[in-house]
Amino acid sequence: MSALNDGIKNDASKIWLFDYDLTLYGEEERFVLNSLDHRIAEFVQKTVGGTFESATEIRKDYLHRFGTTLSGLMAMNGTAPDDFFDFIHEPEYLVYPKVSTEKFALLKSLTGHRFVFTNGRGDWSRAGMARMEIAPAIEDVFDLKLMDWEGKPHASAYEKIEKWLVARGVLNKDAKDKSQIVLLEDSLRNLEPAHERGWTTILVNPNVQAPDWVDFHIPHLLNLREKLISNP
């Protein structure tokens, strides 16, 4: 681990970027993501035919090969992104995370700016944050649509959010040191490009071993409290 692993300064220069699924809610609520994955597999089945089981395997294959299932559907099946999301985000088929006053308090305690950086369309994360009652602690959502449907871990996703942050006036466009950008993610694959750009990386995952290039490793979002160093 890097020397940064001793603690992270909680100061006004920070730009906190949170992945949504399995980051803003944790492994203990995986049933939330499972409900979405079920709908995605149903969409794949509707698109390519076959059994639900074979559609599930195609979903996983596209996710692995293309970064997101949607990217695979677009490349291999000509799927229109909004058709995909309109289908999988029908609320009556989905489960959402529970209210968490602890998460809200933690997020509000973070100085600087706070955004969600997600490979989903923004309505999914916004609905989940509303259910958790943490939405007022997040300034905005940078979603897959704003990435022109090419999400993490593609380099373009990170380039686009940096430009978006510059346009919002929270990142200096000439900044050489980008360690003020802090990405919290459950996926090592999605953290690696952030590390290569000089961002501070926080792996939020209880089930994987963090490699040396990861700056911080916590099992759950709430464990971030233990890593924060506030200005005196």
Predicted segments, located by residue:
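N-terminal helical cap/lid subdomain that shapes the substrate entry/recognition surface
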Residues: 3-102, 123
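Catalytic-core regions built around general acid/base machinery
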Residues: 102-111
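Residue-level marker of alpha-helix boundaries and capping positions
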Residues: 31, 60-61, 116, 180-182
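Asp-based, Mg2+/Mn2+-dependent phosphohydrolase catalytic module
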Residues: 1-14, 115, 121-232
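N-terminal start-of-chain detector that recognizes signal peptides
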Residues: 44-45, 86-89, 113-116, 174, ...
